[in-house]
């Protein structure tokens, strides 16, 4: 909801904690956002979300509202997890919101936004790390447990486990693994990137900025130019202690302009 405003989203549809909104709730959001030119749904790749948003899309079609959907699956850590078939949609979704919101404000058609959205998603890669899992309110305990001296690589925003646990490392070592894994996920290493360091909810901003500094140093050493970077809590997981690293290939120059354009939202 913090990304609703001029230049980004027209509406956000929320379900219960770690639960997809219902098709009826989504349809209400579609109706509220519709201004006659159609509605674009930006959906993170979780099984429940995909099913419910597709049902809502069909319901909107019956009301003669033209609806299209872009699915975000930017997480490179794991292919399948508790809530997904395939890669998860995580913090890179925020950059998709920003770039598509800018182009929608510039008058792009629904079909143009769908095509652009698919290109943005394929150019965006994210990986996360956590020191402590989120506490699910209904359960009253963390989704998984970690010894105090361990971290988990590849965690999801719903507390899904990652791909490896090991002893806590200094920020520079964490940055090294995440940067190298992210860059290696591209078919060809990008020359110019935007970087988002996203806090999961329980990580102090100071630690996020230290990590960003380490990331920027590593990318400079690898000859990768960073022309946009942002730090903060943009896609959180309640009280999870951790962060994620997102990179977007900015070979397409107007994406840079889109990321830098002014918006009137609470959270950007």
Regions found by a protein language model. Give the residues of each.
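C-terminal non-catalytic interaction/assembly regions of soluble proteins
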Residues: 181-268
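Short Gly/Thr/Asp-enriched flexible loops that form oxyanion-binding sites at enzyme active sites
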Residues: 50-64, 83, 207-213
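Glycine-rich oxoanion-binding loops at beta->alpha junctions
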Residues: 6-36, 183
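Short glycine-rich or small-residue beta-strand-to-loop segments that form or flank ligand, phosphate
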Residues: 1, 10-12, 38-47, 54-57, ...
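Short alpha-helices
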Residues: 72-112, 116-123
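Gly-rich Lys/Arg/Thr-decorated short loops/hinges at beta-loop-alpha junctions or inter-strand turns
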Residues: 1-13, 78-80, 151-167
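Mixed-charge interfacial surface used for oligomerization/domain docking
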Residues: 106-210
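Short, acidic/small-residue loops that bind anionic groups at enzyme active sites
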Residues: 7, 12-17, 61-86, 222-225
């Amino acid at each position: 909801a913090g990304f609703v405003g001029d230049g980004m989203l027209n509406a956000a549809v929320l379900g219960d904690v770690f639960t997809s909104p219902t098709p009826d709730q989504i349809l209400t959001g579609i109706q509220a956002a519709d201004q006659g030119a159609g509605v674009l749904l930006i959906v993170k790749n979780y099984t429940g979300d995909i099913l419910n948003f597709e049902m809502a899309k069909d319901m909107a079609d019956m009301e003669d509202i033209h609806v299209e959907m872009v699915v975000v699956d930017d997480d490179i850590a794991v292919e399948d997890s508790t809530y997904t078939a395939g890669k998860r949609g995580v913090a890179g979704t925020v950059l998709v919101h920003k770039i598509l919101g800018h182009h929608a404000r510039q008058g792009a058609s629904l079909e143009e936004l769908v095509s652009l959205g698919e290109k943005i998603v394929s150019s965006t890669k994210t990986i996360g790390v956590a020191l402590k899992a989120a506490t699910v309110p209904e359960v009253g305990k963390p989704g998984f447990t970690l010894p105090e001296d361990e971290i988990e690589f590849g965690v999801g925003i719903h507390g899904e486990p990652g791909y490896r646990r090991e002893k806590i490392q200094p920020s520079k070592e964490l940055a090294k693994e995440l940067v190298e894994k992210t860059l290696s996920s591209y078919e060809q290493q990008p020359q110019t990137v935007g970087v988002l360091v996203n806090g999961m909810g329980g990580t102090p901003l100071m630690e996020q900025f230290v990590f960003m500094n380490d990331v920027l140093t590593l990318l400079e050493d690898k000859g990768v130019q960073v022309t946009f970077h942002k730090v903060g809590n943009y896609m959180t997981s309640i009280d999870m202690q951790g962060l994620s690293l997102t990179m977007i290939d900015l070979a397409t120059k107007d994406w840079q302009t889109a990321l830098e354009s002014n918006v009137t939202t609470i959270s950007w």
